[in-house]
Amino acid sequence: MSILQPLEDLSANIVTLVFNIYNFEHLDGSYTSDLKEHNGIYWCVRIQSNKAAKSQKRRVSIYLVCNPNNSSPDWSVTTSFGFRIINSWGKSRNKISTLFNHTFTSNETSKGTSGYCTWDELTAANSGFLVEGRFQIEFDLNVNSSTGIRKEKISKEKYEKYIADGELITDGKTVKVCLALLADNSPILYNLFYVEKPGQTTFHIFDFTYEAILGMVSILQLDSFEVSVYNYRDLLELGQRYQIPSVTDKCEEFLLKTRYVSIETKLKLSEIFELHYLQFRTLERVTCIHHIDNILDDHMDIGEKTYDALLEKMKHLKTQEDGQLCSCKRNHVR
């Protein structure tokens, strides 16, 4: 449930933005996440913590940052928002902020909490917040109003004439691209463009369809693009191959919302492509021990980490009071 949900007049306009924070245990200073677009405005999260502080006093500060595009000098964005730091051990372990009501301007582009929590709370081995060096922050955001922001979309013709400086060829078709944009988002493509083949502007891409390549480029350019049941798998594989988090995140957002992909498939995908937030949210939907038994019995190819997570979920369900019926109307207490 949204942390803004009590404000019923706002609930219809709330969007949830999920940010991945990588290599958190090495943080010394400030970390700024990838951008997320909402209402024609780009948002990111900034995390601050310094190693110079004594370990027992080291704290973590968290801020939401507003980055409007095509804005006038006197722009403003009035918002209500709050955030959660997601715990891999269950919803009850999440850390939840207070509700913020804030107007972002050119003079105040960020808002959050200084010294929100201690460093040890997030990094301790038994905390449940860090998963392979990464943790996730989920913002519930409502944009009440904005001024001085123009929503402009560059035409395909202008993009190809003034911005595109390279070509990707696949399936005999050509996609015109900005090589620097792709390289900034993918260390693999950076190495290909500027280390292995410097000066080259045309590259053949194998193993991926034209539609997948076009989807990747559209996501990176923040163009309108819909992930669907027909393309999410190709995009996940492409995002993993070229190490492009924004493509993987876009697919994860789709999988979190869709009902046309089964719980079992989502759990498998969450391990294959390291979609920890998807695994967390999908496990929340498993509320019956009988369902877990069926998953474990019918899907022998399920990954080790998912298997362990399901066993933990089963243990949690079995700790219910003796004699209590679970959601399938059965008494599983042994």
UniProtKB/Swiss-Prot annotation:
| UniProt-listed PROSITE patterns | MATH
Q: Which InterPro entries match?
A: BTB/POZ_dom, MATH/TRAF_dom, SKP1/BTB/POZ_sf, TRAF-like
According to the UniProt entry, the coiled-coil residues are none
Note one Pfam family from the annotation. MATH_2
Q: Please list the residue ranges annotated as the BTB domain.
A: 164-229
Q: Where is the MATH domain?
A: 14-141
The record's CDD domains line, in alphabetical order, gives: MATH
Show the Gene3D superfamilies listed in the entry. Answer: Apoptosis, Tumor Necrosis Factor Receptor Associated Protein 2, Chain A (2.60.210.10), Potassium Channel Kv1.1, Chain A (3.30.710.10)
For this entry, the protein name equals BTB and MATH domain-containing protein 39
- What is the scientific name of the source organism? Caenorhabditis elegans
